[in-house]
Amino acid sequence: MLISEDIKLDYSDVLIRPKRSTLTSRYDVDMTRTFNFVHSGRTWSGVPIMASNMDTVGTPKMYERLLEHNMITCPARHYMKKDATWWRVGTTDNKMLGKNVCMMGGIDEIGHMVTHHLKWEFIGIDVANGYTISVIDAIKDIRLRVPEATIVAGNVVTADMTQELILAGADIVKVGVGPGSVCTTRTKTGIGYPQLSAVIECADALMD
């Protein structure tokens, strides 16, 4: 057993210190960024914020609002199952939707969806424990079947596994185990990692 003695921080542990600015209004702030994804070969420009695929977050209304600001929405799973509009996003007969949508699911779910719909720009593998070999295998499988897709995979909280997912073919890594206010992973299993430290360490791993 290894006990880490380093200080680990959650977002609630820190504040953002203000500094001198030449901006005259908050409306002058431009958060647009451009990303070149290594594996998919795609270039994406927008505000790098993703709405989670949680039940009350990844909704059609959320998608409409975030699309106005060029942000990304991950539809909640129950929408993909019951709502044909979401389910058919990215297919050739429904081109109105599909921009800035990341279709996410578990290993079996996303494998089934990819079989029937190959036109999605973003495809996400979302499991509670991203440390299993099955996640690596799923990334490699989807990368082989849809090489032009930008793949999101997780969840992990450490640098070593972040690198493993990227090497397997993921373009974006989903970071976090148990940080949510309604998530019971930490209280029931004792497994987790302070979220701010997880994000910093996983991001640093990609700079090596």
Residues covered by each model-derived region:
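Active-site entrance/lid segments in N-terminal catalytic domains of soluble metabolic enzymes
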Residues: M1-D208
